[in-house]
């Protein structure tokens, strides 16, 4: 008696019914060119964009003053806007920038970019104050800042207060001397903050121990 069942051919190409569904999906993705790699790369780009936005969002910007200024040229007077902007992250970094443009938005944008180019690192104590007394001068403006006890707050006014708050200082006393110009006062405050040193740095500069600083 002969066997009538069909014999399998090892050289035969398997049909669609013999291929698993997952393998068929992979083949279709390969035919379309690249599979899911493109989508994965796009997701990575989006995540990178969000990280960049998070870095930008930690910076705060405050406009101190916007003035309309003019420049005399050959054809007459050219009008523009000048913006004074303070930029800080409230974690010990702050900068003051000035921007000029034909419109207010452009002037503020340039002021923010200029402020980020002139950042100053401010040493903060555990009570969000400054380690020592300091003073700064810019033009005819002079600013004196001194540390304060916890709960005092920021005792300052005008552009000086804006600089101190965006630097992350929460307990400080400041006094303005001389000119009342917002730009000069803000820059004088920046000079005072840039000259601050921690107790450890002061002890190292003087060549004494840290215990002698506190004694």
From Swiss-Prot:
Residue segments, region Disordered: 1-61
Low complexity composition bias: residue spans: 12-28
GO MF annotation terms: rRNA binding; structural constituent of ribosome
Biased composition (Polar residues): 1-11
GO cellular component: small ribosomal subunit
Annotated Gene3D superfamilies: 3.30.160.20, 3.30.230.10
Entry annotated with the keyword Ribonucleoprotein: yes
SUPFAM superfamilies the UniProt entry points to: dsRNA-binding domain-like (SSF54768), Ribosomal protein S5 domain 2-like (SSF54211)
Sorted UniProt keywords: Ribonucleoprotein, Ribosomal protein, RNA-binding, rRNA-binding
HAMAP family listed in its UniProt record: Ribosomal_uS5_B
Domain notes: The N-terminal domain interacts with the head of the 30S subunit; the C-terminal domain interacts with the body and contacts protein S4. The interaction surface between S4 and S5 is involved in control of translational fidelity.
Binding partners and assembly: Part of the 30S ribosomal subunit. Contacts proteins S4 and S8.
Function noted in UniProt: With S4 and S12 plays an important role in translational accuracy. Located at the back of the 30S subunit body where it stabilizes the conformation of the head with respect to the body.
Similarity remark: Belongs to the universal ribosomal protein uS5 family.
Name of the protein this chain belongs to: Small ribosomal subunit protein uS5
């Amino acid at each position: 008696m002969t066997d009538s069942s069909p014999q399998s051919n090892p050289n035969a190409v398997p049909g669609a019914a013999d291929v698993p569904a997952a393998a068929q999906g992979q083949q279709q993705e390969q035919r379309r060119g690249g599979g899911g790699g493109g989508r994965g790369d796009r997701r990575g780009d989006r995540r990178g964009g969000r990280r960049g936005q998070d870095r930008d969002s930690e910076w705060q910007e405050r406009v101190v003053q916007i003035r309309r200024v003019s420049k005399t040229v050959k054809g007459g007077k050219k009008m523009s806007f000048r913006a004074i902007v303070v930029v800080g992250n409230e974690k010990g970094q702050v900068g003051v920038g000035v921007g000029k443009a034909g419109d207010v938005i452009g002037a503020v944008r340039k002021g923010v970019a200029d402020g980020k180019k002139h950042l100053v690192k401010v040493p903060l104590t555990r009570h969000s104050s400054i380690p020592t007394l300091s003073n700064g001068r810019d033009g005819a403006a002079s600013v004196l800042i001194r540390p304060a006890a916890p709960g005092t707050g920021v005792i300052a006014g005008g552009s000086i207060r804006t600089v101190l708050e965006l630097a992350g200082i929460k307990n400080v006393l400041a006094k303005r001397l001389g000119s009342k110009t917002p730009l000069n006062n803000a820059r004088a405050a920046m000079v005072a903050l840039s000259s601050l040193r921690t107790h450890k740095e002061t002890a190292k500069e003087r060549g004494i121990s840290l215990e002698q600083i506190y004694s």
